[in-house]
């Protein structure tokens, strides 16, 4: 049995051409290039993971800045992202709750209407990176900075596995530093919102960056974790937003 992925802009037979989203060749490549750049930054960040983590763990982040970063976490939390998408659904007449019936559940372009396809693409883009991160966390253990004996590590690679664990007992979450799910959700949400509302690109990007930095400032993640989590989110955007035209998406 061969599974095929519908092309961006393809539509089910009961949708007219006027109800289809326009195609903008090259958009997918831009998402993939951005994801590649973040992955490279993530690899390079291994060289600064330990000093940055030690600095944050020592409580040197200014309290006012930390308070601001903590407020931005809502943009990266699954519950917060859900609330934001629900708000967009209620306020934007160009969005409708997607159908989960077959064949609509097969792929966003099989949704009964363009408005439902838009919402389905936004939901999938927001969730894709986070789901990929959860899968990696099942396979790779990395001790979070808050639970690691950072001073005894020769390099950031020592934080993988359980050798860097500072205490004899730790929660399951303490082993799940790599990569950052919060950064993945925040970046995926920012990509989805930017696709639908291009004028807010800088604002959404700033929210995603703040939410990701909050994870480093609170000793929940290393810099490499957030870079690679964001890279996975943009790879998800390449899959679910692909070459759909942002300008067309912004029209209700």
Regions found by a protein language model. Give the residues of each.
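N-terminal transmembrane-helix/juxtamembrane module of multi-pass inner/ER membrane proteins
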Residues: 2-102, 138-150, 154-158, 169
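Aromatic-anchored segments of alpha-helical transmembrane domains
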Residues: 40-47, 130-135, 208-219
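Hydrophobic membrane-targeting signal helices
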Residues: 48, 90-91, 96, 128, ...
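Membrane-interface loops
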Residues: 54, 104-195, 199-200, 208
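Alpha-helical transmembrane segments
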Residues: 42, 82-89, 126, 130, ...
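Structural motif marking the loop-to-transmembrane transition
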Residues: 24-32, 36, 61-71, 75, ...
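Membrane-embedded catalytic cores of phosphoryl/pyrophosphoryl-handling enzymes
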Residues: 24-28, 32, 92, 156-252
């Amino acid at each position: 049995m061969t599974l095929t992925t519908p092309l961006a802009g393809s539509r089910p037979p009961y949708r007219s051409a006027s109800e289809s989203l326009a195609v903008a060749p090259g958009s997918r490549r831009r998402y993939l290039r951005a994801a590649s750049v973040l992955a490279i930054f993530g690899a390079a960040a291994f060289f600064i993971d330990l000093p940055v983590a030690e600095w944050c763990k020592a409580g040197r982040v200014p309290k006012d800045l930390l308070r601001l970063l903590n407020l931005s976490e809502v943009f990266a939390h699954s519950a917060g992202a859900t609330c934001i998408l629900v708000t967009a659904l209620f306020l934007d007449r160009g969005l409708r709750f997607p159908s989960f019936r077959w064949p609509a559940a097969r792929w966003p372009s099989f949704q009964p209407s363009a408005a439902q396809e838009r919402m389905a693409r936004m939901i999938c883009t927001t969730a894709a990176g986070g789901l990929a991160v959860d899968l990696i966390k099942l396979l790779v253990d990395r001790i979070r900075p808050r639970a690691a004996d950072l001073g005894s590590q020769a390099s950031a690679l020592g934080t993988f596995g359980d050798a860097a664990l500072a205490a004899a007992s730790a929660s399951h979450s303490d082993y799940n530093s790599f990569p950052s799910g919060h950064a993945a959700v925040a970046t995926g949400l920012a990509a989805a919102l930017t696709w639908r509302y291009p004028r807010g690109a800088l604002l959404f990007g700033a929210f995603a960056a703040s939410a990701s930095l909050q994870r480093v400032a609170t000793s929940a993640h290393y810099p490499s974790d957030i870079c690679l989590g964001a890279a996975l989110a943009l790879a998800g955007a390449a899959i679910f937003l692909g070459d759909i035209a942002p300008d067309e998406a912004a029209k209700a």
